[in-house]
Amino acid sequence: MLALYGTEVASRLLLGTARYPSPAILAEAVRQSATEIVTVSLRRETAGGRNGGAFFEMIRTLGVRILPNTAGCHGVSEAVLTAKMAREVFQTNWIKLEVIGNHDTLQPDVFGLVEAARILASEGFEVFPYTTDDLVVAERLLDAGCKVLMPWCAPIGSAAGPLNLSALRAMRAHFPDVPLIVDAGIGRPSHATTVMELGFDAVLLNTAVAGARDPAAMAGAFAKAIDAGRLAFTAGMLEPRDMAVPSTPVIGKAVFA
C-alpha cells in the first residue's frame, strides 16, 4: 500500500484526465488502469460551464479520489488562488501544485513553487508539488510543509522518458522515506517500469495514455508495467557486473580424463 498524507491506496498509478478523445474513453481508461487517484484541472471544471459540471459528475461515478491541480498557473498568487478555488469546488485539501516558469519546456518555477507550497501548507493544504529532480529544491519543499514530492523525468507531454537516471537515483537515495511520484515525461510503459525499478513510489500519467491509439488498452499496459517495476524493486534485482558469472554449478560435474 502507498500512503499519501494518511490516505492509503493500492494502485501506484495516478492518471490525468485531460486530452482524451471522449468522456467515455476516459472513463474506460480509468477503469483499465485500476487507478484510485485522478488529477483534474480547476480550469477544465470551470471553463466547461454546464459541460464541466457533467464531466465532474462522471469522474465521481468512477469511485476514484480527485487530486485537483493548478495547471497553467505561472505565478505564486495565481497558483494559490487557483488552489483555494479548487478546494471549494472539489471539497479536498489535496492539491497538485504547479507553478510554471517556462512556456516552451513547462519547467517548474521552483522559487515560486516553494513559496506557494509554504503558503498553502500553512493554510491546511496537503501539497503534491510538481518539481524538478534538484535535491536542494526538494529539501526546500519538504521544509515548506510538503510530505510528497513529484519530480519530472522529462518535460510535460514530451514522452521522452527518464532523461537523467542518475539524478532520479540520487533523489530516491537521498529521500528514502518520502513518497516520490514521477510526474511528467513518461511516454512508454517501459519508461514507467524503469523509474519504478529505481524505487519510486508511483507514476502520474496523462498524455502517454490520452494520446495513444487505444487509451484504455494503454492504461492497462501501464498498470502492468508499474506493477512489474515495483515488484522487481521489492524482489531485489541483481547489480550489473563487468565479468561473467556461471549460472550452472560446476560441483559434481563429470571429469573425463
Curated annotation (Swiss-Prot):
Localization annotation: Cytoplasm
Q: Which InterPro entries is this protein grouped with?
A: Aldolase_TIM (IPR013785), Thiazole_synthase_ThiG (IPR033983), ThiG (IPR008867)
UniProt entry keywords in alphabetical sequence: Cytoplasm, Schiff base, Thiamine biosynthesis, Transferase
Organism domain of life: Bacteria
Q: What Gene Ontology terms describe what this protein does at the molecular function level?
A: thiazole synthase activity
The record's EC number reads: 2.8.1.10
Q: Which GO terms describe its biological process?
A: thiamine diphosphate biosynthetic process
Q: Which Gene3D superfamilies match?
A: Aldolase class I (3.20.20.70)
Q: What class of enzyme is it?
A: transferase
**The protein's assembly and partners:** Homotetramer. Forms heterodimers with either ThiH or ThiS.
Q: Which family does it belong to?
A: Belongs to the ThiG family.
What is the protein name for this chain? Thiazole synthase
Q: What organism does the record attribute this protein to?
A: Rhizobium rhizogenes (strain K84 / ATCC BAA-868)
Q: What is the lineage of its organism?
A: Bacteria, Pseudomonadati, Pseudomonadota, Alphaproteobacteria, Hyphomicrobiales
